[in-house]
Regions:
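Short glycine-aromatic motifs
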Residues: 1-3, 20, 94, 99-103
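Acyl-donor binding region in acyl/amide transferases
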Residues: 46-97
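Short, charged/polar, Gly/Pro-enriched secondary-structure boundary elements
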Residues: 117-119
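Conserved donor-binding loop and adjoining core beta-sheet/short helix segment
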Residues: 17-63, 104-106
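Short amphipathic alpha-helix that is part of the acyltransferase structural core
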Residues: 1-15
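Conserved catalytic-core motifs of GNAT/GCN5-like acyltransferases
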Residues: 100-114
Length: 119
């Protein structure tokens, strides 16, 4: 398994948790199929959130890397780890950054951030 961030490759989920910047693609069932690796089955959705946001150009209906890097940087500056935030907090920060469309999963985690123009 090779998880990707701009500075290094991560070999474990623990490293992924530490760096949180991952480049992955998603199949039609929402499973993580990455160009650099696959997250283990059963990885909580909360830990996969950035993977689902930070997808490749193969999935143009979801926001691309450059916007996700902005999002990651913003959360980092605010002292948050993205997957630890509540849905209302996520909504607030998405709104601040111009993420106007998103869907929620039944378990309460925001799953998809759709590609759209920032207002």
């Amino acid at each position: 398994m090779r998880l990707y961030n701009p500075n290094k490759y991560c070999e474990t989920v623990e490293e992924f948790d530490k760096y949180m910047i991952v480049k992955e693609t998603i199949d039609g069932n929402g499973h993580m199929i990455g160009r650099f690796g696959v997250l283990p089955v059963g990885t909580p959705w909360s830990k996969q959130l950035l993977c689902q946001i930070m997808v490749s150009e193969d999935y143009p209906h979801v926001r691309l890397i450059k916007d996700c890097l902005r999002l990651c940087e913003h959360f980092d500056k605010m002292g948050y780890r993205l997957y630890a935030m509540s849905v209302p907090e996520l909504r607030r920060f998405f709104d601040v950054l111009g993420f106007k469309e998103y869907g929620e999963m039944d378990d309460g985690y925001i799953r998809w951030i759709y590609n759209g123009k920032t207002q």
